[in-house]
Amino acid sequence: MEKEYSPKKIENYVQEFWKKNKTFEVKEDPKKEKYYCLPMLPYPSGKLHMGHVRNYTISDVISRYQRMLGKNVLQPMGWDAFGLPAEEAAIRNNTDPFSWTQKNIKYMKKQLQSLGFSYDWSREITTCHPEYYHWEQWFFTKLYEKKLVYKKNSLVNWCSYDKTVLANEQVIDGCCWRCQNKIRIKQIPQWFIKIRNYAESLYQDLKKLTHWPENVKNMQRNWIGRIKGFEITLNVFNTCQKLKVFTQRLDLLMGVTYISISSCHKLSINLSKKNELIKKFIKKYRYISQEEQYKVKYTGINTNLFVVHPITKKTIPIWISNATHIEYGTNAVLSIPGHNENDWNFAVKNNLKIKYVIFNPDHQEPKLYTSFLDIKGTLFNSQEFNGLNLKDGTEKIKKILYKKKILKEKINYKLQDWCISRQRYWGTPIPMAKFKNGKMIPIPENQLPVVLPKIRKNTNLLQQAINFNSKWAEIFIHGKHAIREIDTFDTFMESSWYYARYTCPNFNTGMIDSIASKYWLPVDQYIGGIEHAIMHLMYFRFYHKLLRDFKLVDFDEPVKNLLCQGMVLSEAFYKIDSNSQRKWFNSSSVLIKRNTKGEIIESHTQKGEKLIYAGMIKMSKSKNNGIEPELIIQRYGADTIRLFIMFSAPVESDLEWKESGLKGIYRFLKKLWMLIFNYIDIKNTHKKINFDFLNHQQSELRYQLHKTIAKVSDDIGRRQTFNTAISEIMKLVNQLSKAPIKEEQDKSIMRESLICIIKMLYPFTPHFCFFVWNYFNNHSSIDNEKWPIFQKDILSKKYSTIVAQINGKKRCATKISDSLTKEEIFLYIQNQPIIKKYLEDVDIKKIIYIPKKIINFVT
C-alpha cells in the first residue's frame, strides 16, 4: 500500500477489474431476494452534467447497499435516444440524428463508467434502435385493435418554433416546455391514447403508493382533476333539444340564473353557422390553451336561447363563456353568481340576475362565494326547500330530479386523452397506414418494425425525409396499396415502458418475457427529478396499467419507492451586452472577490469587465454555469465527487456546488487513507478481541462503532438520509484517529473499526474501499462482502456522564459504563490526563462520590 492516496491510479485499476469480471451482471435467481433499483434513463445530449451525476450516484449508493444486504440487485442503464434536441443538433452540425446520437452515447457511456456506477451493461437499451421500438409499435397496434387509440381532428398546442404538437403537460405558462416560445392553438389530425379511460384507477391507485413523496402524488391528483358531481339533462325552451349540464352543488340549484357553455360545445358550433357575432366570439376564444383560460378576463355572448329550470319551470338564459373549461366534461355548467365569485363577476359584467339561496349559520345574512367543499348553512329563497340545511336540501332535490329521470351522478376529470403524435422526423414511426378510400389500418405484425427512412442530409420534418425516400411511404397491405402514417410517437412513449424491457432486453419473441418480468418487477426504487412528477410519471403509471391489462406484467403499479432528488446549483455570472441580452460566463473564467464570510462582493472577467452575480442557480448550458465532471475526476477522483454529492445536502434538497466542499471531502479520504497506512500492521492484527478484558476506552470505542453501524444502516436503508450517514462515519474516523494504539487489543479494535468503516463507505466510495479492502482480506473482493451488523448487547449497555472535580471545581466530564465498580471508576478518572496533571505530587485527602453524577477529589 502506497503512502499517498492516488485516486486516478486506483479508480482505473478497479474499473478495469469490474469490467473484466462482469461484476454487476445479474440473472434471475428464485433463491435470492431481488432488488430492482432504477435511475431515470438519460437523454444523450452530449455530456453528463452534475444533475445526472447526482441522480446516478444516489441510485448507485442504494444499489451497492442493497447488494451488501445479500440481495440480487438489478441496476440497468440505457438511453432515451429519440427527440427534438438531437434532431436540431444534427441540423446545426450538418449530420443526421442517428450519427449524432450514437456519438453522444459513446461519450456519455465512458463518462458513466469513469464514475464507477455498478450498472449491468449487458442490459443496455437504446430507444432509437429498431429492436426496441419494434415492440412499442406492436403494442400500439394491439391498443388500436382494442379501440384504445384513435385519430381525430383536434385542437392542439402548437409550437411554431419546433413545428410540432405539445401535450397539455408540456405547456408551461402558455409556453413550450422546451424552447419557452409562446404556443398557439391549432387544429390538425392527431393520434390519441385513451388515458381518460384509466383516470379513475390512476387517481385511486395513488393510495397504494405509500412510499412516494406526497407532493408528487398531490401534483398527479390535481392534474387528473377528479370532480364528483351531477349531470342534469335540461330542456331547451321552445325546441326539441336537450342540454346536459354539470354541477357539484345540487343544493344551489334554486340559485341558478344562467347556463354557461364553452365555445367548443356542440350547441356553440351549430349557432356559429348562423350567427356571425357568435362565430367571431368562438374564433377568438376557442383557440386558446386551457392554461390561458385561467388568465383571460371573463367574457361571453348571449345565445338568445333558454333552458327550462327543472323545478321552477322558469326560463334560464344560455351564454357562451370563455370561462367554461372543457375540463368539466359536458362543456356546460350551472352558473350560480350569488355563491360563486367567477359567476358573480360574469353576471355583473353582463347585467345578469344574481340570486342568493344560502344563509350563514346565524341566519343573519346571505352566505357569499360558497366553496364547493363548504356544507354549512341554511337554504332560503328556495321555495319548498327553505329552512333545510345543505345536506338535506341536496337529498330532497336529488329525489325530485331522479324521479323526473333527468339526473345522474357523474365523475368528471380534467385529464385529457394523451396526444401521442408528433410532426418530426427523429422519433418512432407510428405503425399505421391509410388506403385510398381513407380507411386506416395498422401495419401487419410481419411487417414490423417500421424503420425510419434513411436521409442523406439533415432535415427537421419527416415529410421532407419521405421526399428523399419516397418508396418508404408506400406500402402494400393485404395486396392493396397504402400510404404510411408520417407522424412519429411522442418520445414519452419510449420512456413509459423501458423499465420493463430492462428485465429482458434480448428477448426477441415478444415485448416482455413474463418469467423475467415476474421476477424483477415492480421496480423497488426509482430515482429522478421532481420535474417529472406529472408528465413522465403519469404516462409511466398509465402505460404499466395498459401492459397489465394485456397480461404482459403483473401488479397495478410499476414502482414501489420513488425518490425525487433536488437540483444541483452553481454560481452564475453575466453581463448585459450591446443588444441588451445577458451574456453568461463560467465561474472558472471569472475573477471573484469575497468578504470574510465567503460572500461574493465583486466579480470581473479576465479583461476586467464588471460582471453581475446572479446567485446560486440551477446548473445549465444556457447559464454557462455547469461543471465538467471529467475535470473534477482528474483533480480529485470519482469517489470524491460521489461522496461530496451525497454529503453536501439531503437528497430531496437542492445542492450548492462549492469546490471548498470538494476539497474538504478529498482531505477526509486522504486522512482515512493515512489512518489505514499508519496504524494497521496487516500481519500482526488478526488476533481476536478478548471482550472480557477491555478497558474503558476500548469499550467506549466499540460502543461508538456499533452505534455508528446502527445509525448508518438506518439512515441509508430506511430514512435515506445519506448525508447524516456520512457524517456519522466521519465522526467515527475522527475518534479512531485519536485512539491510542498501545497493545494488541487496541490493534484488534482498530482493525474491527476500520473494516466496518470501509464496508459502510463502500456504497459511496467504491474504488477507495475496493482497493484498501485487499489489505484486510486477500480471499474475497469487497463487492461480495455483507453489510456490517451492529451488536445490540453493546448498545444496550448503559452509560452515565460523570463530572470530575478537584476541590469542588469542575475539570472534565467523562462518559463511563454503569457496569464499572466504584474502584474502577476512581482509577479510570484519576488516570485521565487532565485530572492526572492536577493530582500529580498531591495527596488526596478525601474522595466524594455521588454515583452516576459527580466525583470530587479533595486535596
Curated annotation (Swiss-Prot):
Single Gene Ontology BP annotation: leucyl-tRNA aminoacylation
Keyword ATP-binding included in the entry's annotation: yes
Keywords: Aminoacyl-tRNA synthetase, ATP-binding, Cytoplasm, Ligase, Nucleotide-binding, Protein biosynthesis
Domain of life: Bacteria
Coiled coil: none
Catalytic activity annotation: tRNA(Leu) + L-leucine + ATP = L-leucyl-tRNA(Leu) + AMP + diphosphate
Motif ('KMSKS' region): 618-622
Localization: Cytoplasm
Stored InterPro entries: aa-tRNA-synth_I_CS, aa-tRNA-synth_Ia, Leu-tRNA-ligase, Leu_tRNA-synth_edit, M/V/L/I-tRNA-synth_anticd-bd, Methionyl/Leucyl_tRNA_Synth, Rossmann-like_a/b/a_fold, tRNAsynth_Ia_anticodon-bd
One Pfam family this sequence matches: tRNA-synt_1_2
Signal peptide annotation: none
Motif ('HIGH' region): 42-52
E.C. designation(s): 6.1.1.4
A GO CC term assigned to this protein in UniProt: cytosol
Main subcellular location of this protein, as a coarse class: cytoplasm
Positions that bind ATP: 621
UniProt GO molecular function: aminoacyl-tRNA deacylase activity; ATP binding; leucine-tRNA ligase activity
Family: Belongs to the class-I aminoacyl-tRNA synthetase family.
HAMAP family, per database record: Leu_tRNA_synth_B
Annotated protein name in UniProt: Leucine--tRNA ligase
Biological source species: Buchnera aphidicola subsp. Acyrthosiphon pisum (strain APS)
Gene it is expressed from: leuS
